[in-house]
Design a protein with these regions (language model features):
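Short, hydrophobic, well-ordered secondary-structure elements
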Residues: 1-25
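Long, charged low-complexity segments
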Residues: 24-124
């Protein structure tokens, strides 16, 4: 069975989106931000809850994840995702399977954000 890299990449982004929405909804339950992660991060005020170093890690991780993630990847085939990543030139300099490597990077970036943001979240 073929690995579903597109779904893995999609869920990495959705996990971060969900975390940021949890923060946003406490501040403004009706704010509509779409699926744009940088706007969600800004609206979440997560930076106010973390250290300077954690804030820098979140920014770097979010930029890296956002380059790869799009909300419409949910039902995307691996072939279409390969084309998407090639168009963004994210296949350059990668040894081996660039699709697998980009998914690994996306998951690593999402994990970094979640490891920082989840413990700081305080439900209202």
């Amino acid at each position: 069975e073929a690995a579903q890299y597109s779904f893995a990449l999609y869920t990495a982004g959705v996990a971060v989106e969900s975390l940021l929405r949890a923060y946003v909804i406490q501040l403004d339950p009706i704010l509509e931000t779409g699926h744009y992660l940088p706007l969600l991060l800004q609206a979440s005020k997560l930076h106010q809850a973390v250290t300077q170093r954690e804030s820098e890690l979140i920014d770097i991780s979010l930029i890296t994840l956002t380059r790869r993630w799009k909300n419409d990847l949910r039902y995307t085939s691996n072939q279409r995702l390969r084309r998407h990543l090639k168009k963004l030139k994210l296949d350059r300099g990668v040894r081996g399977d660039f699709l697998k490597e980009n998914c690994r990077i996306a998951i690593e970036m999402a994990t970094t954000i979640l490891k920082i943001g989840v413990p700081k979240w305080k439900p209202s």
